[in-house]
């Protein structure tokens, strides 16, 4: 009936997996984990493929592009904030 063709369907984009936010850096054999970009922060770290980045460095990298400047992979944008207990549970 109409002369217009329907638009082809867009491919489904799977959502990026959620990455957990580390409030405190995990201790390791060689000391604490730090942000691999600024080498200063050891709190509020997000895991990016094989290293950790702080929130400040992630936001500054996202302003410049979508890929990590250290490993070249996509920067994690979906962050899961875990609930940490603030007091011991009552029995």
UniProtKB/Swiss-Prot annotation:
Chain span(s) of sequence motif PTAP/PSAP motif: 85-88
Domain notes: Late-budding domains (L domains) are short sequence motifs essential for viral particle budding. They recruit proteins of the host ESCRT machinery (Endosomal Sorting Complex Required for Transport) or ESCRT-associated proteins.
Post-translational modification: Myristoylation is required for the role of RING finger protein Z in assembly and budding.
Keyword Metal-binding: yes
The protein's name: RING finger protein Z
Top-rank taxon, per record: Viruses
Signal peptide per UniProt: none
Membrane topology: Lipid-anchor
Zinc finger annotations (RING-type) as residue ranges: 35-71
Keywords linked to the UniProt accession: Host cell membrane, Host cytoplasm, Host membrane, Host-virus interaction, Lipoprotein, Membrane, Metal-binding, Myristate, Viral budding, Viral budding via the host ESCRT complexes, Viral release from host cell, Virion, Zinc, Zinc-finger
Gene Ontology CC entries for this record: host cell perinuclear region of cytoplasm; host cell plasma membrane; membrane; virion component
Record's subcellular location: Virion; Host cytoplasm, Host perinuclear region; Host cell membrane
Gene3D superfamilies: 3.30.160.310
Function: Plays a crucial role in virion assembly and budding. Expressed late in the virus life cycle, it acts as an inhibitor of viral transcription and RNA synthesis by interacting with the viral polymerase L. Presumably recruits the NP encapsidated genome to cellular membranes at budding sites via direct interaction with NP. Plays critical roles in the final steps of viral release by interacting with host TSG101, a member of the vacuolar protein-sorting pathway and using other cellular host proteins involved in vesicle formation pathway.
InterPro entries tied to this protein: RING_finger_Z_arenaviridae, Z_RING-type_Znf_sf, Z_RING_Znf
Family: Belongs to the arenaviridae Z protein family.
Predominant place of localization: virion
One GO-annotated biological process of the protein: viral budding via host ESCRT complex
Lipid sites, type N-myristoyl glycine: 2
GO molecular function, one term: zinc ion binding
Primary gene name: Z
Subunit annotation: Interacts with protein NP; this interaction probably directs the encapsidated genome to budding sites. Interacts (via RING domain) with polymerase L; this interaction inhibits viral transcription and replication, Z partially blocks the product exit tunnel for the releasing nascent RNA product. Interacts with the glycoprotein complex; this interaction plays a role in virion budding. Interacts with host eIF4E; this interaction results in eIF4E reduced affinity for its substrate, the 5'-m7 G cap structure.
